[in-house]
From Swiss-Prot:
The gene is tal. It holds the Pfam family TAL_FSA. Transaldolase is important for the balance of metabolites in the pentose-phosphate pathway. Gene3D superfamilies: Aldolase class I. Pathway: Carbohydrate degradation; pentose phosphate pathway; D-glyceraldehyde 3-phosphate and beta-D-fructose 6-phosphate from D-ribose 5-phosphate and D-xylulose 5-phosphate (non-oxidative stage): step 2/3. Keywords: Cytoplasm, Pentose shunt, Schiff base, Transferase. NCBIfam families: fsa_talC_mipB (TIGR00875). GO terms for cellular component: cytoplasm. This is Probable transaldolase. Belongs to the transaldolase family. Type 3B subfamily. GO terms for biological process: carbohydrate metabolic process; pentose-phosphate shunt.
Length: 218
């Protein structure tokens, strides 16, 4: 399973990249706003940090012709750009056209298995089901991941399932259990995966016992 960082903050991405925990990056208009940076400038900088992984940059347009124009600008930033598109009629149309051009695409804001099926038919590189946002509406987001996995396996679709809207460490576990290809994770959640109270308690116990031995390793 691959881990993408859901962030447009250079410092956050760099810190995780140094631990070899980053397989890619996803951004969206909200994250760009939070960064306070120009989308083209910050996206180019991110692409230099994650040379071997895709970086999703989202169009702001909603009409086909405008989507294609913005996609051309974003695709020109770097070879590892993945064009993020809304899961709408025009978004699907653009996905088909961009895929034909050999560009990577990420259809976002997926909330149903039917939408995911259409994304695969359109040749999307990634489909982004929003797990946490479904949970907010009282719908189990992990169930959607399982449904999409089943459909994609049934028909050998190559579109990768990119679990998005990850709010908790449990969402990451659910994504892995469902067979999602990728989870895009906020930096705070990714770091939280490392922690467990029993690990910390056990380490403290070992350190206390080690002091009692009076030894030094180096």
């Amino acid at each position: 399973m691959k881990f993408f960082v859901d962030s447009a903050n250079i410092e956050e991405i760099q810190e995780l990249q140094n631990l070899n925990l980053v397989d890619g990056v996803t951004t969206n208009p909200s994250l760009i706003l939070k960064s306070g940076r120009n989308i083209l400038e910050v996206t180019k900088e991110i692409c230099t940090l994650v040379v071997h992984g895709p970086v999703s940059a989202e169009v702001a347009a909603t009409e086909f012709e405008d989507i294609m124009k913005e996609a051309a600008v974003l695709a020109n930033i770097a070879d590892n750009i993945c064009i993020k598109l809304p899961l709408t009629f025009d978004g699907l149309k653009a996905c088909k056209a961009l895929t034909a051009q050999g560009l990577k695409t990420n259809l976002t804001l997926c909330f149903s298995a039917n939408q995911a099926l259409l994304a695969a038919k359109a040749g999307a590189t990634f489909i982004s089901p929003f797990v946490g946002r479904l949970d907010d509406y009282g719908i189990n987001g992990s169930d959607l991941l399982h449904e999409i996995r089943t459909i994609y396996n049934n028909y050998s679709f190559e579109t990768q399932i990119l679990a998005a809207s990850i709010r908790t460490i449990n969402h990451v576990k659910e994504a892995a259990l469902s067979g999602a290809d990728v989870a895009t994770i906020p930096p705070t959640i990714l770091k939280a995966l490392i922690k467990h109270p029993l690990t910390e308690k056990g380490l403290q116990s070992f350190l206390e016992d080690w002091k009692k031995t009076g030894q030094n390793i180096a």
